[in-house]
């Protein structure tokens, strides 16, 4: 069922109203406490700016880190409020706590178009327990609820799910709407052929995604460390490469399922090996049936890159989740960088390219190609769960489209 979004609300719905907006401001900080990547803050700007223009009173709720229900001075949202003030060109008032007298006072003093950022919602232990009393207190600060935190939508927490019981309307923000349009759209009604590229180190973390994508895709391309579990399941020697021995039967079952469904499941034909796990390790490129003892695979080989490029050439929709190798080490980044370049080229030809969260986003950004993709997801776990076909509590709780 489609969800109501901010675009469905009129000026009358928003002007002068106190609007609680759940955002994802869980940004990386360096040792000095400065933000090193403000992508998530920028991603929320369209929703915040729209509410300011419509003269709403904007109350932002966010989490940062994992303080485990206690105040942690290193996890306060002060750097976020400062950066947001710069981006908006106006003062963002931060509260001492997300509920209580200080929050109530600062919200009460708001004028139309003002922005208040509530302190880290996870400083309160009841947030992650989705406690109804805490949700009620948080909701009492506002009249309207907007969820724009796709990255936290897979959590049934008080600020993502509980507050919707006390606030109406409860709608999706622009970022949430865009995420659902691309990710849900790619799963439910894609332009075909639809391909998924799944990487990363472990089969175990992508079981649900692989099973779901084999059901929905025309082609599934597998890279990253998980390929060695598939190779070992085929009886090949994999040297010191990462293998999940308890997932060998699963790997066989996934290959069997793809074959039965007529889905093209592609594994690399060659790999780049290292003699140890380090950026300056000795390396060699070999066919997958020629991996010597004492060596480990850290990237897909050049032949495999060409194999994958050929498979993707006619695709109209491509979802990518997980790198092809240890792209953090330049010597083992070619597979991942080549896929980034290929997807950028496909985008230019009209293919819908979706980067489904996590390390693949970092890889595309490192390659300087993020702007060339159709959609870069801001959610790691949320993207995975949506691709698995799971219901996201933070989305399910929003009002259905009328």
From Swiss-Prot:
Q: Which SUPFAM superfamilies match?
A: Phosphoglycerate kinase (SSF53748)
Signal peptide span? none
PROSITE patterns per the UniProt record, alphabetical = PGLYCERATE_KINASE
Q: In which pathway does it act?
A: Carbohydrate degradation; glycolysis; pyruvate from D-glyceraldehyde 3-phosphate: step 2/5
> Any idea which positions bind substrate?
24-26, 40, 63-66, 122, 155
Q: What is its main location?
A: cytoplasm
Q: Which enzyme type, at the first EC level?
A: transferase
Task: From the Swiss-Prot or TrEMBL record, state where the protein is found.
Answer: Cytoplasm
A Pfam family: PGK
Query: InterPro entries of this UniProt entry?
Result: Phosphoglycerate_kinase (IPR001576), Phosphoglycerate_kinase_CS (IPR015911), Phosphoglycerate_kinase_N (IPR015824), Phosphoglycerate_kinase_sf (IPR036043)
Any coiled-coil regions, as ranges: none
What does the entry list as the binding residues for ATP? 206, 297, 328, 357-360
Q: Which GO terms describe its cellular component?
A: cytosol
An example of a GO molecular function for this protein is: ADP binding
Reaction(s) catalyzed by this protein? (2R)-3-phosphoglycerate + ATP = (2R)-3-phospho-glyceroyl phosphate + ADP
Key words of the record: ATP-binding, Cytoplasm, Glycolysis, Kinase, Nucleotide-binding, Transferase
Q: Which GO terms describe its biological process?
A: gluconeogenesis; glycolytic process
- Enzyme Commission code(s) on record: 2.7.2.3
Q: Which family does it belong to?
A: Belongs to the phosphoglycerate kinase family.
Q: How does it assemble?
A: Monomer.
Can you name this protein?
Answer: Phosphoglycerate kinase
Q: Which organism is it from?
A: Prochlorococcus marinus (strain SARG / CCMP1375 / SS120)
Q: Which gene encodes it?
A: pgk
